[in-house]
Every structure is written in structure tokens, then in C-alpha cells.
Amino acid sequence: MVLLYTPKQKTNNVQTITADILDLDYQGLGVAKINGKTWFIENALPHEKVECRILEDKRQYGHATAKKWRVKSSERLEPKCAHFMRCGGCQGQHIPIEMQRKAKQSALFKRLSKLQSEPISFQPMICGDAWAYRRRVRLSLWFNPNTKQIDMGFRQKNTNDLIPVQSCEVAEPAINYLLPKLTALLEKFSTPKQLGHIELVAADNGVAMLLRYTKNLAEIDRTLLLKFAEQEKLMLFLQSDKGIEQIYGDAPYYQFSDGIKLHFDIRDFIQVNSALNERMINTALDWLELSQQDCVLDLFCGMGNFTLPLAKRVKSAVGIEGVFEMVQKAAQNAARNQIKNIEFFQADLDQSFVEQPWANQSFNKILLDPPRSGAAFALNALCELKAEKILYVSCNPATLVRDAEILCDFGYKIEKSAVIDMFPHTGHLESITLFTTK
């Protein structure tokens, strides 16, 4: 007897909810309450009624994405980018910029206000242009077997699929100018399958470009790249498994209005928003009320983004960074700018630094700009220095609140705070907060 196999029909397990949106959180998600549970809903605005697909359903909260609108907000905007909600770069192009900023301010102020009874001076948001602000982009490359061509673009949200792009609404004009030219260049490559990705950085002395490849680059392709770099006046870098080599152009740098130049390598971390970076630094200098009598410590200093401007205004400055190569670059930047009242040291700031020789110095003011994980491991030793002012630059409100609570327990109070709108149309919340002794 022959048994015939009949496959079971697949069932549709997609779960949906209908929600009335009450508020907007700082990440650009609509907030709803259903049977006492809080739901965070993508692509939804206050006063909208939406049908949503559930993405995550936990005991105390849920995450969903809007699929159909029964009621739409009159404030909803048409996104500028055709790839919005597919590309993972922007989350808030449908939200008016003032609404985005208000949600971020409200989130920070509510969290910090719970930490102390004394009033906090919440300052106006530090903001700039909402579009064309990114000076760095990373573009994935994929050989399309159907067209036999290279596709260049951004990864689709939550997948490895590629969205080909010819422009990006939040990238600087110098980067957008190059995108169609790069597409045309890649079509000429003899060995397109071995290409990985491209990074573009709009430095103040031109655009730096890095091409990642996985196998030996054919000489004909290398020549194509060199001619392109010469024609477009690029600083060209190639990256293989052996490392990175610069094959054309000068070293990239960015420059502050006071004349300080910071040279960097193509893969080094730099703030992507050039204008807001300088405004953030100027705010830090202003809030610290610097004088020629001050001795300042800069923790998580990188290559000297804050340290060099600090040193020009004080008696002495010391920068601490965990990555030795960045310590070297910071020292080189100080030497290039002829700033001599400055020292840099390597230290793991995920551990106590009380035994470090530089920690025996006297610092009356401290600045720290930690990663998203915050600075909890450094705070005990930091507080032992008994500085009169501590300025904390944060890229994560959760770790800022955690660390602020530690500082308050050590006898500091929050004097003032402000949101920095470093990344418009995204859920990132950058802030600057000043702590003083009680």
C-alpha cells in the first residue's frame, strides 16, 4: 500500500492588536495601554488609532508595529526617504522634529528629576539641522546573481537583505554627491564578488573612503579606484584581512572654530554630527567655568575631542583612554596643535583606577564621555578625587540615571542638564549633565 503524504497547511500565527496611542517615547515609539499593559508601537503617533502586528509580548510590556490606521494624526508627516521603515537607519521621519525633541527632553528630565529633591536647571536643547547632518556612512555591497552587478546600500531593518540607495537624506551633501558615482564605478569592477563594504567619512579636508575586500584585489580594479580617488580628490583606504592601507590622499582631520585640528584614521570613532559636536564641546567648556587655575581630568577621552579644547583654557589637562592606539593619537594631536599642558594615559576604566600614578594628581574638575555601558566601574575612584564639578556626556539615558544616582550618593547634586539632538529622526538620546558638590 502506498501512503500519500499530505503536508499540513501552514497556519497564520501573526497576532494583532488595536491600540489608541496616548504618548510618544524618546525612541519615537507610540505608547498605548491595553488591559494595564504598556505597548510600544512603531510608526504610531499620539491620538492615532492603529491596528498593529505584535512583535514581542512580555508580561509587563509589549512591542508592536502599526499596519493599519483607523484614525491618523494630523501632525503625521510624509517621510522624506523612500526607504523609511525598511532601512534601519531612521525611526522617526514621520514625526515632526519638534515632537521628536520634546519627547527626548521629557524622557531625560523625568528620569533625572526623580534623583533629587533640589531643582535641576534644565537647559534648552542643543540642536541643529535635522537633515544632511551625518558625516559618516557605511554601505554594504552585494553581488546580485540576477543582474550580475554590485548592489550598494544599507541593510534592511532586522534582516541581512540589502536596500540599494543612491542618496541618504541624513548624510552630508559631500557623501550624497559620491553615491551615484560609486555605483557607476562598481559596475566596472572585474571581480565584484570579493567586495565587502564601503565607508565614507566627510572630513574637513575632503572625503575619506574605505573599501573592504575579501580576496586579493585585481590590479585593474586597484587602478580604477586610484583614478576615481584622484578625480574626486578622495583619501582612499583599502582593507583586507591583513589590515588597512592608505593608497591615496592626506590624513583626514576635522577642525574646530578655534583652530584645533584633530587627525583621525578612517575607522576611528568620531562624532557623526560635526556641527553638534562643536556645540556640545562649547557647552561643556561653558558649564565647567574654566580658568587658568584649573586642573582637569578627561575620562574616556578618545583621541582628544574634549581634552584639547579643555587644555587651551586651563592650567593642565589629563586624558585617560582604554585603547592604547587612541592614546597615541591623542598625544600626536596635542603635539600637532602645540598644546603642551596636556598628558594622556592608557587605563581600563572598567576597573578602579586608584592605583594609577596619574590618579595621585589633584583635579578640581572632571569630564567624562563614556560608552553606552556608562561609567559605573570608574565612579567610586572618580568620587575619591573630590572634584568640585563633574560634567557627564551620555549617549544612554538608562546608564546616565544609574551613574547619576551613584554620584548623588557620594554627595554630588545635578546642577543642570540638556539634551543634545545629535541624531535627529533616530531613537538615540545624547545628553550633557553637570554635577556639583552639595
Curated annotation (Swiss-Prot):
UniProt xrefs under Gene3D superfamilies: 2.40.50.1070, Nucleic acid-binding proteins, Vaccinia Virus protein VP39
Limits of the TRAM domain: 8-68
Keyword Transmembrane helix carried by entry: no
Record field: transmembrane: none
Gene encoding the protein: rlmD
Reactions that this protein is recorded to catalyse: uridine(1939) in 23S rRNA + S-adenosyl-L-methionine = 5-methyluridine(1939) in 23S rRNA + S-adenosyl-L-homocysteine + H(+)
Residues at which S-adenosyl-L-methionine binds: 271, 300, 305, 321, 348, 369
Organism: Haemophilus influenzae (strain 86-028NP)
Protein name (record): 23S rRNA (uracil(1939)-C(5))-methyltransferase RlmD
